[in-house]
Regions:
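Carbohydrate-binding surface patches
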Residues: 207, 219, 605-648
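C-terminal beta-sandwich/jelly-roll accessory domains of carbohydrate-active enzymes
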Residues: 631-710
Length: 710
């Protein structure tokens, strides 16, 4: 392919009314002909030829206004747009409901455009910034400023992303506690739908990630447009396929009426909207999100130790002797970090009391945590701890002393959830108290990791200031304790998004560690997040949530593709199980550099009961592929898997990788290459012919290692 010099390539514009932002795979054309900037093209790179505005000018239809209503990045009714507006709000007397912004100034480079819009009548300014990141991710940010003398009640600030009519299908992601990140496909012809969240945190039920694509788009084929709003509170993504025949996504934070007031000479910054385009299917779109995360959004920390969390091992039954024995076994099998979960602080013998009182319970730990930490450290492991700072139990000293610190609406009695209430994180005194408690804990003990939980939804409460307060507290703690890694947990995967990502190093993907469910949960979560930031643990033989039983090999094969951990009382494990687990962890450590830096991909398969995914090094020197049978299908065979990540003319050696006894279905003879131990194929052979697989039992995986012949 012809490659351009991206540093010297000039702007493509027929006149000053078209801006062309680009990188080597993406073009974004912004029209400035109207009152506000409008994205008129968002897709594959368009090349060097000059563009004319007529390319984007449509007919004016009868039966409506006498112009083709433009879809601005901020859509507004004053321009004839009859869909949802980008800015919704008013002054206290109800005026100002229809702001009319006009571009007052702009600047741009080849990868960014910055616009200042002004409504002189309402004394409102709006700053919009559009940027193409090196990963190919498009970001839109904006800030609304009140230059007048009256407060402005903002009800919504959302950005519009146009999608061409050929995008006929939608992929949305959501689920429930213990079964997050399920994928749902729906047709998108002439309809409008909304992915909307009112729960006050990112939520298990609906995820702020949406993909639109051409008919039957797949992992490696079809054109895909995706978006994400980086925010850990309420959000709304409206998918409009009707209004003026402009298919578009209207993306942003969801605000409750009266929740956000912009006072004179103050501003409000909207959550960042992230967008991707791929002409090669879903996996390519996700890889752009992954690259974006890796290259700058997250606080980089290369240490991702194998973790043992004590929750499912002992629950609230904290006992020094038991925990030191558990630490001994953990160190023996290769664990690198030992995490003490819920139950260590004052009054916390069950989930009805103690939240808010963040001091070590002297009745359980008469000598503090130092003896346990010293024992863990002597075994060569790091020590981590669990907390849930945003919550409080009514049965706690904190609540008895400060009942007014609880988040509530008006005079109504707040509703408990999991026997707990929510602290008002908008209050600086609340945040200062929590900062002091957690800082004292981190200063007193050698703690390298904090699992930060959030175990209930908000009810009848504004989420905006609550979310910002949590960000501020986490940011302060990260700044003062840069050596500590933080994990975002919210009853599992209830708070995973780009908004909280700068403040944390890891996410707890789901409270369910059942490997059969986790296969689908992790697939969905990796649509946005790279595997190395997702906690993937090997659970006990019987899942504590589903009560299903699975082999260690299957549990390990599932947990391999992420930040590995253990959620299992290893004191109950047999010597054989411990030895097997030690072997798995040793294998993981050799694969960790590949798994945490390579290109993560999914592949389509004709049998919906078969999942194919993997990770390939950027130079294709090595790869690991998983083939999983979720359930029995119409055929006993596993049809060949077609792998599209590899250079056509390069040669590769393919070998099976066994983490235990292979779970082959009944057979007389295996494919010859498996008995032989390897096979050599070109990249073209892998994509066109496919790799022949063995017959698999339900709930089992077959792992393949691929090495490039240099």
């Amino acid at each position: 392919h012809h490659r351009l010099d991206w540093q010297t390539y000039s702007l493509v514009a027929a006149n000053d009314q078209l801006l062309h932002l680009y990188d080597e795979r993406l073009s974004v054309i912004i029209s400035t002909r109207g009152n506000v900037p409008a994205i008129v093209y968002w897709g594959s790179f368009l090349g060097q030829n000059p563009l004319q505005h007529d390319l984007f000018t449509r007919a004016v239809l009868g039966g409506g206004v006498d112009l083709d209503p433009p879809l601005g990045i901020i859509a507004q009714h004053h321009d004839g747009w009859l869909g949802n507006p980008g800015v919704e709000g008013c002054f206290p007397d109800g005026s100002g409901s229809f702001p009319h912004f006009i571009i007052s100034s702009s600047t741009n480079t080849t990868t960014s455009a910055n616009f200042t819009l002004r409504d002189a009548d309402l004394d409102l300014d709006l700053q919009i910034n559009v940027d193409i990141h090196a990963s190919g991710v498009l970001t839109i940010t904006g800030a609304l400023s009140n230059r007048g003398s009256l407060p402005y009640l903002l009800h919504g600030l959302r950005f519009a992303l146009p999608v061409p009519p050929r995008a006929q299908e939608l992929l949305t992601i959501g689920g429930r506690w213990g079964m997050e990140f399920g994928e749902q496909r729906t047709p998108w012809v002439q309809s409008t739908m909304s992915v909307s969240n009112n729960r006050g945190r990112t939520s298990h039920e609906k995820w702020p990630v949406v993909f639109a694509g051409t008919t039957q788009f797949g992992e490696q084929h079809g054109e895909v447009w995706g978006c994400h709003v980086g925010w850990s509170g309420n959000f709304d993504i409206t998918l409009d396929g009707v209004t003026e025949h402009h298919k578009h996504m209207l993306v942003g934070e969801k605000l409750i009426a009266g929740e956000l007031v912009i006072r004179p000479n103050e501003s409000h910054s909207a959550p960042t909207v992230y967008a991707v385009h791929s002409s090669q299917g879903l996996s390519s779109a996700s890889q752009q999100f992954h690259q974006f995360v890796r290259s700058g959004l997250r606080h980089e920390n290369a240490s991702r130790p194998v973790t043992l969390n004590t929750w499912e091992a002992v629950y609230f039954d904290h006992n020094f002797e038991t925990l030191t024995k558990l630490a001994d076994v953990a160190a023996h099998v290769g664990v690198e970090r030992f995490v003490l979960d819920d139950g260590w602080f004052s009054g916390r013998r069950n989930d009805t009391a103690g939240l808010g009182d963040w001091t070590v319970d002297s009745s359980v730990w008469p000598n503090g945590l130092t003896p346990l930490i010293n024992h863990v450290k002597s075994l060569g492991m790091e020590f981590g701890i669990w907390c849930e700072p945003e919550m409080v139990n009514p049965e706690s000293d904190l609540y008895r002393q400060h009942p007014n610190w609880v988040l509530h609406s008006g005079t109504s009695r707040p509703i408990t959830g999991r026997n707990q209430l929510v602290l008002d994180m908008s209050r600086i005194d609340v945040r200062n108290y929590l900062f002091t408690c957690i800082s004292q804990l981190l200063d007193a003990y050698d703690i390298s990791y904090v699992k930060w939980d959030h175990n209930r939804d908000l009810v009848a409460s504004p989420a905006h200031s609550q979310t910002l307060g949590t960000y501020e507290l986490l940011g302060r703690l990260k700044e003062t304790h840069p050596q500590v890694q933080f994990e975002s947990c919210a009853s599992g995967g209830g708070r995973i998004d780009f908004g909280i990502l700068p403040y944390v190093d890891r996410f707890w993907t789901s409270d369910s560690i059942d490997p059969l469910d986790r296969m689908l949960i992790q697939r969905g979560a990796q649509r946005l997040m790279p595997p190395e930031v997702l906690g993937t643990h090997i659970g006990s033989p019987i899942s504590h949530i589903t009560r299903r039983s699975h082999s260690l090999a299957f549990r390990a094969s599932t947990a391999l593709f992420g930040w590995l951990g253990i959620e299992w009382n290893l004191l109950d494990a047999s010597t054989h199980e411990r030895d097997r687990l030690a072997s798995v962890i040793a294998q993981y450590k050799t694969l960790r550099p590949l798994l945490h830096t390579g290109l993560s991909f999914q592949e389509d398969h004709p049998d919906s009961n078969i999942l194919v995914h993997g990770v390939s090094a950027h130079d294709q020197s090595q790869s690991l592929v998983s083939v999983t049978r979720l359930a029995n299908g119409p055929s006993s065979h596993v049809d060949p898997i077609h792998l599209h990540q590899f250079d056509d003319d390069a040669t590769f050696i393919i070998r099976p990788l066994h983490l235990g006894t292979p779970a082959y279905a009944p057979h007389r003879k295996l494919p010859q290459w498996i008995d032989a131990g390897s096979i050599t194929m070109t990249g073209r052979h892998m994509s066109e012919i496919g790799v022949v697989c063995p017959p698999l039992l339900p709930a089992s995986s077959f792992l393949i290692q691929i090495h490039k012949v240099m």
